[in-house]
């Protein structure tokens, strides 16, 4: 109870000090409101409400329920509801750590999860992350329980966790991709191949069922096959700017570049001074980029002609250094998502490393980065001890890293979905080594 009380206090403080409802929360809220009041899964505009598929229905469904219970657009109530889900996630992670190691590891995981400011901070903004973490935690606990006692009710709980995780975010589908085969891999040794195969297949098939009506709706409304959500969050017929995106992938490695360059594309001015030195391979390329930015800034619109010029510039840069494009920059983006100070929801400068401009914020960000690193190191120690189901945990993390390496615009929140596993493994690190039983894969 002390851990949960401390965790609740931390989350309430974030809601009081750093609430955030601008941007994506309002997009989700608009969809939920139109869905509830008008029966249209869509966004509002000057011309009325138009259907959309840029967001999956999992989080708007949650907001609809909150709006019905607590009042329309009562986002504070949404945040406090998310606190309850996040604390439940802490308990589920603790239960999972106890199952893969010991009671001591479970207690350690509970405290680590409850007092983690990185996950707690996301309860203060109406976004998918808190519910996604809950689904992952529920899946981990149900997975371990199913392999201890293979009852069909845990198959149904797992299927719910898999499907709702994917209904919240398309990358949530990785949970089923990692754990469904693991049911067979681990369970066949204990309970026989036949039963575990039936359970794994049933779980996988049930987790797909909610996407049937969503896919049919998208086909009926937009005449496209879209079982998840589009990569670039665009409705059919809207431009995706492949040239600009490809050029961005030759430049961006951190959140500052994502914010100042990628998100400003087609919405705001682009400033050459915001680009890092790696954006130019030669003085001629610097001049070419400057001219391209100047032409774009005349209207702040990526026209087909502007996009084609970005594509040519990207092709030139890839030809100059293919290793940088295909290996070095993806690895750098991945490292930034894991190691960057997780201050994206705090009122901290994006360029946190510029000490002369804001020394106090730089020092705070460095401390935040050190805390993040401590969690990662503890998790690595726990993984080294190789508790039960470590293979499944590692498979999920590696699958997620492989997916994130394909992104052109890194954000630290994309690695947050690995934190339930990190909490459990870090809990194992606090186990007494003399008491720890090193278990097989």
Segments and roles (model prediction):
Residues 2, 77, 90-115, 133-134, ...:
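Transmembrane-helix signature of polytopic, membrane-embedded enzymes
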Residues 9-14, 26-51, 58-61, 65-66:
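Extracytosolic helix-loop segments that constitute the early lumenal/periplasmic catalytic or substrate-binding loops
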Residues 103, 139-155, 184-190, 430-433:
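Membrane-interface transmembrane helices that cradle and orient dolichyl/undecaprenyl
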Residues 76-77, 299-300, 308-312, 316-394:
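Membrane-interface anchor segments at the N-terminal boundary of transmembrane helices
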Residues 80-101, 138, 142, 377-381:
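Transmembrane-helix motifs of polytopic, lipid-linked glycan transferases
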Residues 57, 61, 69-91, 110, ...:
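Loop-to-helix entry region of an early transmembrane alpha helix in multi-pass inner-membrane enzymes
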Residues 23-26, 54, 77-85, 108-143, ...:
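Multi-pass, polyprenyl lipid-linked donor-dependent membrane glycosyltransferases
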Residues 227-343:
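Membrane-proximal stem/loop segments at transmembrane-domain junctions that anchor or position
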């Amino acid at each position: 109870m002390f851990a949960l009380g401390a965790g609740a206090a931390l989350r309430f403080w974030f809601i009081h000090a750093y609430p955030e409802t601008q941007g994506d929360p309002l997009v989700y809220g608009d969809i939920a409101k139109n869905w509830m009041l008008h029966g249209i899964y869509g966004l509002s505009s000057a011309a009325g409400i138009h259907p959309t598929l840029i967001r999956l229905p999992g989080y708007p469904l949650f907001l609809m329920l909150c709006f019905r219970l607590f009042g329309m657009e009562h986002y504070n109530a949404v945040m406090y509801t998310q606190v309850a889900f996040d604390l439940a996630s802490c308990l589920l992670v603790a239960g999972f750590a106890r199952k893969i190691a010991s009671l001591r590891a479970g207690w350690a995981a509970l405290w680590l999860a409850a007092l983690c400011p990185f996950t707690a901070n996301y309860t203060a903004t109406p976004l998918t992350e808190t519910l996604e973490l809950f689904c992952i935690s529920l899946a981990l606990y149900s997975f371990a329980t199913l392999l201890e006692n293979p009852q069909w009710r845990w198959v149904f709980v797992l299927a719910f966790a898999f499907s709702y995780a994917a209904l919240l975010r398309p990358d949530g589908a990785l949970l089923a991709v990692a754990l469904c085969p693991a049911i067979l891999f681990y369970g066949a040794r204990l309970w026989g191949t036949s039963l575990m195969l039936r359970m794994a297949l049933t779980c996988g098939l049930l987790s797909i069922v909610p996407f049937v009506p969503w896919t049919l709706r998208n086909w009926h409304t937009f005449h496209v096959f879209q079982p998840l959500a589009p990569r670039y969050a665009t409705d059919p017929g809207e431009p995706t700017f492949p040239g600009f995106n490809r050029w961005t992938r030759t430049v961006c490695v951190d959140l500052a570049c994502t914010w100042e360059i990628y998100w400003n594309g087609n919405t705001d001015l682009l400033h050459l001074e915001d680009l890092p030195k790696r954006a130019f391979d030669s003085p001629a390329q610097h001049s070419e980029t400057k001219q391209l930015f100047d032409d774009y800034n005349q209207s702040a619109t990526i026209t087909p002609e502007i996009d084609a010029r970005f594509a040519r510039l990207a092709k030139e840069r890839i030809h100059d250094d293919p290793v940088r494009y295909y290996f070095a920059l993806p690895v750098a983006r991945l490292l930034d998502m894991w190691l960057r100070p997780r201050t994206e929801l705090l009122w901290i400068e994006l360029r946190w490393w510029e000490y002369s401009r804001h020394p106090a914020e730089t020092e705070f960000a460095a401390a935040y980065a050190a805390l993040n690193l401590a969690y990662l190191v503890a998790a690595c120690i726990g993984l080294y001890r190789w508790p039960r189901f470590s293979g499944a945990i590692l498979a999920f993390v590696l699958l997620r890293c492989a997916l994130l390496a394909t992104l052109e615009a890194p954000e630290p929140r994309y690695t947050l979905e690995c934190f339930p596993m990190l909490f459990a493994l870090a809990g194992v690190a606090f186990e007494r080594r003399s008491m720890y039983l090193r278990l097989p894969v």
